[in-house]
């Protein structure tokens, strides 16, 4: 007999499942450019789509790794046999994915690249990918014992209002270096895209689109038009004048 749970509890349970799944995949697929996960529930099975920049590494040799991940997810979350399927999907535009860029910056810093040089490299790549703006903040023991933060900004960035929810992609990562832990925060402002592929379909509220005027057809030969004469309008009857009384 199926146990009935309230809508509130179901939303909470779904949120916990997605958060735990995201944390597990972030740890497991960090080196493969993991960029997020989508969960689609159908009446017969649950489909989990893993978004990554290097999908071949996620799949593994002859699909071995994806089968191992499927078995782990099935066992950990108590799915019945064969009711869960994992798919790997390539991120369309790597430069517009904040998680992918935060991971890229993390590995650059782990490789010993200078903070300023690594951040400017990421900033340039994001802007070349077609972003409207971006912001990279690195904080921690950058030089010496005193902690400080460095902010690198380019282009346009909105910070308030409802459009932030669908125009700004944000990611936070931590990297452990010899001098301590550094925090990385990447914010990317996506461009407006009417097709909805690389950015939101809905334009910004202050966006003004100017319609191009239609081209007028210039007559090449002189023409004359005979306009019909207006019919005579009937005159309104004269108002009777008041008669003065003695």
Swiss-Prot record:
Chain ranges of the KH type-2 domain: 21-92
EC number annotated for this UniProt entry: 4.2.99.18
Entry's Gene Ontology BP terms: apoptotic process; cell division; DNA repair; positive regulation of apoptotic signaling pathway; regulation of translation; translation
Keywords of the record: Apoptosis, Cell cycle, Cell division, Cytoplasm, Cytoskeleton, DNA damage, DNA repair, DNA-binding, Lyase, Membrane, Mitochondrion, Mitochondrion inner membrane, Mitosis, Nucleus, Ribonucleoprotein, Ribosomal protein, RNA-binding, Transcription, Transcription regulation, Translation regulation
Location in or out of the cell: Cytoplasm; Nucleus; Nucleus, Nucleolus; Mitochondrion inner membrane
Free-text function comment from the UniProt entry: Component of the small ribosomal subunit. The ribosome is a large ribonucleoprotein complex responsible for the synthesis of proteins in the cell. Has endonuclease activity and plays a role in repair of damaged DNA. Also involved in other processes including regulation of transcription, translation of its cognate mRNA, spindle formation and chromosome movement during mitosis, and apoptosis.
Family: Belongs to the universal ribosomal protein uS3 family.
Name of protein: Small ribosomal subunit protein uS3A
Source organism per UniProt: Xenopus laevis
Lineage, opening ranks: Eukaryota, Metazoa, Chordata, Craniata, Vertebrata
The encoding gene: rps3-a
């Amino acid at each position: 007999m199926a146990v009935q749970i309230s809508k509130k509890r179901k939303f909470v349970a779904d949120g916990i499942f997605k958060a735990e799944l995201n944390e597990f995949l972030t740890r497991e697929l960090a080196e493969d450019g993991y960029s997020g996960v989508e969960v689609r529930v159908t009446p017969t099975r649950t489909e989990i789509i893993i978004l990554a920049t290097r999908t071949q590494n996620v799949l593994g040799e002859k699909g071995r790794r994806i089968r191992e991940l499927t078995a782990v997810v099935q066992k950990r979350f108590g799915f019945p046999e064969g009711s869960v399927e994992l798919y790997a999907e390539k991120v369309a535009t790597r430069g517009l994915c904040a998680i992918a860029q935060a991971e890229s910056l993390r590995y650059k810093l782990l490789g010993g690249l200078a903070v300023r040089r690594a951040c400017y490299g990421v900033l340039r790549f994001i802007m070349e990918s077609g972003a409207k703006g971006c912001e990279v903040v690195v904080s921690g023991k950058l030089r010496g014992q005193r902690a400080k933060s460095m902010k690198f900004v380019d282009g346009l960035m909105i910070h308030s209002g409802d459009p932030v929810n669908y125009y700004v992609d944000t990611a936070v990562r931590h990297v452990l270096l010899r001098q301590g832990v550094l925090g990385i925060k990447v914010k990317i402002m996506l461009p407006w895209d009417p097709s909805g592929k690389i950015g939101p379909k809905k334009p910004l509220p202050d966006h003004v689109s100017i319609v191009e005027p239609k081209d007028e057809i210039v007559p090449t030969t002189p023409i004359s038009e005979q306009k019909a004469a207006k019919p005579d309008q009937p005159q309104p009857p004269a108002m009777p004048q008041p008669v003065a009384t003695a």
